[in-house]
Amino acid sequence: MKAKLSSDIAYISLYLNNIGGGSAIFCVQARTITLTFHYICTIIPLTIMTINKEIESGDRPLNFLEEIIEESIAKGETRVHTRFPPEPNGYLHIGHAKSICLNFGLAKKYGGLCNLRFDDTNPAKEDVEYVNSIKDDVRWLGFEWAGEHYASDYFEQLYLWAEDLIKLGKAYVDDQTQEEIRLARGTVTVPGTDSPCRGRSADENLDLFRRMRAGEFGDGTKVLRAKIDMAHTNMLMRDPILYRILHTDHHRTGDKWCIYPMYDWAHGQSDSIEKITHSICTLEFDVHRPLYDWFIDELQIFPSHQYEFARLNLTYTIMSKRKLLQLVQNKIVSGWDDPRMPTITAMRRRGYTPAAIRAFADRVGVAKRDNVIDLGLLEFFVREDLNKVAERRMAVINPLKVVITNYPERKTEEFECVNNPENPEAGTRKVPFSREIYIEHDDFMKEPPSKYYRLSPGKEVRLRYGYLIKCEEVIEDANGNVTELRCSYDPASGGGSSSDGRKVKGVIHWVSAQHARRAEARLFDKLFIRENPDAADEGETFMDYLNPESLVVQEIFTEPSLGAAAPGDKFQFERVGYFCVDKDSAPGRQVFNRIVTLKDSWAKINK
């Protein structure tokens, strides 16, 4: 019942996030309060029955994008074509995963298409390595694109359209420096001032622009700007830059081009070329939409439409590519795939499943306002999926040796163990048992409190799938540390019962000392100790909130069946947590990454 209740609480949080635009944040007296499981449980009078019905049926409220699409369908506009347009200058993170799931998910739900388009307009920062990693991430999440496109595919068409704007008197070449352009743009309260070059004739601008393409000018000496309105209330409409000169080879076009389009120029026109119906961006691009529409209207091309939703923000997590790069460069983490990073490749290595990420992305909803999602929600979905698919194994993280004094010294037997109680088809396995075993240090207390059901002097406990044992003697070192236990066993208590019918509440896991395999466990935790590491106090940075215990490396003992596990295989170490075999594993020396604990230990610590 307790486990079921925790699941219900998590779903209440997700349910609320889909109501009224999807905000999971309430603002009370100018303070932003992020809803956590415990907070929701105490303040929200929703019944468990209502939530369970929604979960079982698979229904949830429509998000605002689905409402827009369904309204269009009702009017006969049935075509849905979306796109996911990453810039290939880094690795995707969990925020991108939400966008991937949204764009591909909408296309699938409404029988449409979703393109993968690389926004490769900045050759100085882009690389084919990132292109390949992005494709791997999208496929790993379970999606296949309708078409693979690149903004660079459209460089010629974008150039010709730029010439069209020049001929229409809607664009001009500017000789001002970047700083001069910035200062002349004005502020939100002060109008901008026209460039001295704004009055050039169309013929002069066309000649200069063609010479820019021919490579006659140096980097930064000229730009092409749209001629809109230097007094516009939206500063992005104050003659935005369309092209800049950059003598840098492109990873696809080589040295063919020395002028490159800016994002705002390439974005909407690429959408139009691909006949995208729903161009979905994050909220910060809301102010870009008037410019997006202006270009399409002036060129009189296919009218794609831009819509904005709130980006994903997670507690105890940073998403800034610049800050993530700092972590890598300063060797705070081992690389972009360090399992503590929020990148998709890191989550994959850690052992997160695509199904869990898809379920999380679906349930957090699509908001119109910025919100912050508790990291525990993501971990909840990871546990839910792994509980269904991960086979059970026994492993001891902090071993304490136990000698069963009345068990024959040379005897070995095997117990039949269930691989996954959630899936009968997973079958069973044999686990060896012998006179000496290892148990968890935490499963023994010399002076236990009341209602302590694990092992203590003179008390009995059941070994998982095995016998009842009783602690007869405690061996300590010179400092009083417990180093070994001497126990007796009841030979008639195998198979989960006892000859006299006595009941023993405590059940602990174990491994046979004779058969155990040594392995390395990497116990990962949150990378930051502050809920919002981006909100640094004066004189501090996000680096000041690093969790010194985000990685603990431990030598462990595992049951022998784990010797056949391969990198990427996932297991539940019974009573410990979920673990994944890491790529650093070598013959005779396996490495296991802790994916998540069995329970939300962080919430307990911070009560």
Language-model-detected regions and their locations in the chain:
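N-terminal catalytic cores of NTP/NDP-binding nucleotidyl/phosphoryl-transfer enzymes
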Residues: 58-70, 74-135, 251-282
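Conserved short loop/turn motifs at secondary-structure junctions
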Residues: 85-90, 117-125, 147-156, 179, ...
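Active-site cores that bind ATP or allylic diphosphates and position pyrophosphate for catalysis
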Residues: 120-122, 128, 150, 164-323, ...
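A glycine-rich helix N-cap at a beta->alpha junction
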Residues: 131-152
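Core subunits and conserved enzymes of cellular information-processing
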Residues: 295, 364, 372-607
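Long, charged, mostly alpha-helical binding arms that flank functional sites
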Residues: 303-381
